[in-house]
Amino acid sequence: MRSLIYRQLLTNSYTVDLSDEIESIGSKNTQNVTINPGPFAQTGYAPVNWGPGEVNDSTTVEPTLDGPYQPTSFNPPVNYWMLLAPLNAGVIVEGTNNTNRWLATILVEPGVASTTRTYTLFGIQEQITVENSSNTKWKFIDLMKTTSSGTYTQHSPLLSEPKLYGIMKHGGQLWTYNGETPNAITNGYPTTNYDSVNMTSFCNFYIIPRSQESVRTGYINNGLPPIQNTRNIVPVSISSRSIIHQRAQANEDIIVSKTSLWKEMKYNRDITIRFKFANAIIKSGGLGYKWSEISFKPANYQYTYTRDGEEVNAHTTCSVNGVNDFSFNGGSLPTDFVISRYEVIKENSYVYVDYWDDSQAFRNMVYVRSLAADLNDVLCTGGDYSFALPVGQWPVMTGGAVSLHSAGVTLSTQFTDFVSLNSLRFRFRLSVEEPHFSITRTRVTGLYGLPAANPNNNNEYYEVAGRFSLISLVPSNDDYQTPIANSVTVRQDLERQLGELREEFNALSQEIAMSQLIDLALLPLDMFSMFSGIKSTIDAAKSMATNVMKKFKKSGLATSVSTLTDSLSDAASSISRGSSIRSIGSSASAWTDVSTQLIDVSSTVNTISTQTSTISRRLRLKEIATQTEGMNFDDISAAVLKTKIDRSTQIAPATLPDIVTEASEKFIPNRAYRVMDNNEVLEASTDGRLCAYRVETFEEIPFDVQKFADLVTDSPVISAIIDFKTLKNLNDNYGISREQAFNLLRSDPRMLREFINQDNPIIRNRIEQLILQCRL
């Protein structure tokens, strides 16, 4: 465009701080090789290992080995082993159903010749003959009778070096061990009413689930782990297993310590995290068979949920780190299917979810310690994405799945225009799951991970439930709020100034003379002349330009620019005003995905109006790269901006960067663009209106979407400053020649000035409408 301000912003023709450039490069750099980011990745905090403190949990986790418990009499649960650990020889356990089974187990020390000993069994003294020929191992012997007055018989002896024994109720039988360690095996005794058998233990014992078979057998054969063989382990009463566990409250605010001005508050919160992935799918130029990129993008999600009767408003941002780059090349022909790069997250990737809600816990989250979280896992499965080829069957990327496992939590900060919010960043490590992903009708199959094509699988969101805990240093007076950063107050004050400046700018639209505007739009405005009304020195202007570019780099228009190919960026920085247009190949990427949408309009539920309303920014970028010798919308925008800056009484260095950036995106939102093919003109406006007509007669003809897409790819896009409605009205009322019509179609500034100097009401009204659209 004629005015250079936006092009200078696009090409970063002014120097910026080295730290800003390093930060920018680091944020845009894509790595094919993923490194382990560590537990404090992408945060500004040192790698300090804070202890989690106490985290109340409403979930009971069953221990592998529970005990030791003191000798007692009770009814053990079914499918749980009593692991008996006697210290001395004698009776160690007895149990009966009082009907047809009396079972007792005795322990005999090593090296005992056959002898008769007296044992007290079920309260009665009995004479039992025992022996143990082993000199190193202890001998467990089961004594059994089937009537209350019967005689005991000996069964299933176990020679044990660790001196451990087990008994369990399961499947209608009483189970014990027999044989010789380290190869002991189990043996069962059928017992009626087995589940009601009471056991009396005469030694310390443990309880271990039947499901832990390999662990339990290892204990029987080899002994308890070393930590259990110490006098620091004190047996407790079995009644401790019956303690009622209080369920933790969903919201808990606990005062840890307090002084006159400050207090430490511990916040325990149940949490529901909902998040979703976002992606970018970009087609390459050409015939429509090639895709340049399928990548993940950060995704914001806002939602509400109920926590302990309280409605919580939450906000999450999901991003990925450590993506894996894949590609598919079906051949070198223009009609061969190609995906230059598509991203996949796998076990070497991480998913970050930044979470904030409006509860008390986040109000003063500035000085925080003892941060901990416990979250459930979540399975993310990929859906189908069809690659719409112009001809032939469409390949479909389908499948793929990963599980997300909690891998830590740190503090993070989310910035808005009004306030910076301290939030929690939950980090998830990944593991690949079934099914694998593939691309149908290609050789790509049997790959694992989650591709970026359709990561949400048509789900609105993924959900993770859990709990977090933190201790925060907050003011003792609950009415005070800890200042998060000075930028909060500064930003709020700046927003007030910007609001006043916007009102002034919008009011100044009524005072701009159109002849002055056209003349100013023809000038090669640059950064220095744009800021000349504020600072006179070159150094100050450079500083101002640097600040403008810092703002502009984060704007929506700059984001769109960054998605274009390098060749388009080069063309945008080197193009000069002339009658011939180049950068055709580079600019194709700015339109290809839009043309595809328009071509496929018949197969979608969206209307042409809806689809064309989404292409305004790309048409605008195409206009920047393909200039003619006529004026365009950005010439008018820059001229209006310059005029308002000169007339403003409230403009200041602090507010100028925001105003320039905002103007580059919002001035003249309702734009119309045209392409020309000999005597035919096709126009598309950003509000969805399409029209086609012949220049000589201004007769409307059917709008050919395919032709429009082809012309946009191969021809300059012209700003329709004087749109078709205005042209037809001008011709019907005043009559214009063919040459005048073509000059107005090209937005020739000399022709525009001529009509304005003649005080033509139709042209004047059109320009006034454009000026009034230059609003903030």
Swiss-Prot record:
Region of interest called Spike foot, as start-end residue ranges on this chain: 510-776
Site annotation Cleavage: residues: 231-232, 241-242, 247-248
Q: At which positions is motif DGE motif?
A: 308-310
Is Disulfide bond one of the keywords UniProt gives this record?
Answer: yes
GO CC annotation terms, alphabetical: host cell endoplasmic reticulum-Golgi intermediate compartment; host cell plasma membrane; host cell rough endoplasmic reticulum; host cytoskeleton; membrane; viral outer capsid
Which Cys pairs does UniProt list as disulfide-bonded?
A: 318-380
Q: Per the record, which residues fall in region Spike head? A: 65-224
Q: What positions belong to coiled-coil segments? A: 484-511
Specify whether Protein transport is a keyword of the entry. no
Q: Which GO terms describe its biological process?
A: permeabilization of host organelle membrane involved in viral entry into host cell; virion attachment to host cell
YGL motif, short sequence motif: residues: 448-450
* Pfam families referenced in this protein's UniProt entry, alphabetically: Rota_VP4_MID, VP4_haemagglut, VP4_helical
Q: Which family does it belong to?
A: Belongs to the rotavirus VP4 family.
Reproduce the miscellaneous comment text: This strain probably does not use sialic acid to attach to the host cell.
Listed name of the protein: Outer capsid protein VP4
What does the record give as the organism's lineage?
Answer: Viruses, Riboviria, Orthornavirae, Duplornaviricota, Resentoviricetes
